[in-house]
Amino acid sequence: MTTNSSGKPAGGISWRTYLALCKLKVVGHIVFTAIIGMFLAVPGVPPLDTAFWASLGIGFAAASAAALNHFLDRHADAEMARTQNRPLPSGDIRPAQVVGFALVLGIVAMAILIAFVNMLTAFLTFLSLIGYAVIYTVYLKRATPQNIVIGGAAGAAPPVLGWCAVTGSVHPYALLLFLLIFVWTPPHFWAYAIAKRDDYAKVDIPMLPVTHGIAFTQLHILLYTILLFLAGLMPYVTGMSGEIYLAAALIFGGIFVYYAIRLKRKADPRLAMQTFAYSLVYLVGIFSALLVDHYIVL
C-alpha cells in the first residue's frame, strides 16, 4: 500500500487523522491520573498486568469519548477559528467514519476491562464515557454556564478507575483524588474560556465568560483555586499522604492561587492562557507528589 508524505494511504484516511480524533494529550493526562490511582491503591507495586490492561482500556475509552466529542461538536468546530482544522471541519474524514471509529474504540475498551480487569472498573469507565461524550457534550455544554462544573465529574473519574482496577472497590482515598480533579476542572477550563471567549460566543456555547462576563469569571477562578488549595491539603490531613506531599501541595497550590490573583487583577488573554497552562503543571505536579510520597517516607 502506498502512502503520501502525510501518512495518508492512497485513497484512504491518514493515520494522523485518527490520532487527532483521539486527543492524545487529553488521553495522556487521563491515563496518567489513572495510573497514579493504581499505585496509590496498594502499599507496594500493583500487579503490572492489571495496570497495563487497565491503562489500555481506560485510554481506549477516553479516546472513544474524544472521537464522539469531535462528531457531536463538528458544527461548532467549523465556526471557531481554533477548531476549524480539526478532522471533521477540514473534511479529512466523514462523520459516519468518526462514529464507527469511536464505537470500535469503546467496544475494545469495554472488552479489555471486562476480560482483564473487573466489571466494576468497566462499568464506571462506561459511565464516565457517557458522562463526557453524551451528558456533557450533548446537553450540559449548551444548557448552562455551570457546564464544566457539573460535567467535570466525568473528567475527575480516572484516578478512581485506576484505584478500582487494582482493588475492585472504591476507597474514600480514591474519592479524595476525584475531589482534587473535580475542583481543579473549573478554574482550568474557565481560564481557557476567558482567552477564547469570542469563539464560544460565536457558536452560542454558554461558557461562564460569555454569560456572566470576564470579571465574574475571574472572581470564580480565584474562589475555586482557593478551594482547590484547601482540597489539596486533604490527603495530608486525612493521613493518606505525608510531609513530601504537603510541601508540594503548598507550593503548587500557592502558585496556582498566585496566578488566579494576577488574573483577577488584569483581564489579559495571555495571562489567562498562562493560568491555563499552569493548571496542567499543577495537576501533574500534585499527582506526581502523591506518588513520590507514597513510596518515600520521611
Swiss-Prot record:
The keyword Oxidoreductase does not apply. InterPro entries: Protohaem_IX_farnesylTrfase, UbiA_prenyltransferase, UbiA_sf. Keywords: Cell inner membrane, Cell membrane, Heme biosynthesis, Membrane, Transferase, Transmembrane, Transmembrane helix. Its EC number is 2.5.1.141. It is an enzyme of class 2 (transferase). GO terms for molecular function: protoheme IX farnesyltransferase activity. GO terms for biological process: heme O biosynthetic process. It comes from the Bacteria. It holds the Pfam family UbiA. It is a multi-pass membrane protein. GO terms for cellular component: plasma membrane. Its main location: membrane. The keyword Methyltransferase does not apply. Pathway: Porphyrin-containing compound metabolism; heme O biosynthesis; heme O from protoheme: step 1/1. It catalyses: heme b + (2E,6E)-farnesyl diphosphate + H2O = Fe(II)-heme o + diphosphate. The chain crosses the membrane at residues 26-46, 52-72, 98-118, 120-140, 148-168, 174-194, 214-234, 241-261, 278-298. HAMAP family: CyoE_CtaB. Belongs to the UbiA prenyltransferase family. Protoheme IX farnesyltransferase subfamily. Converts heme B (protoheme IX) to heme O by substitution of the vinyl group on carbon 2 of heme B porphyrin ring with a hydroxyethyl farnesyl side group. Carbon 2 of the heme B porphyrin ring is defined according to the Fischer nomenclature. NCBIfam families: cyoE_ctaB (TIGR01473), PRK04375.1-2 (NF003349). This is Protoheme IX farnesyltransferase. The gene is cyoE.
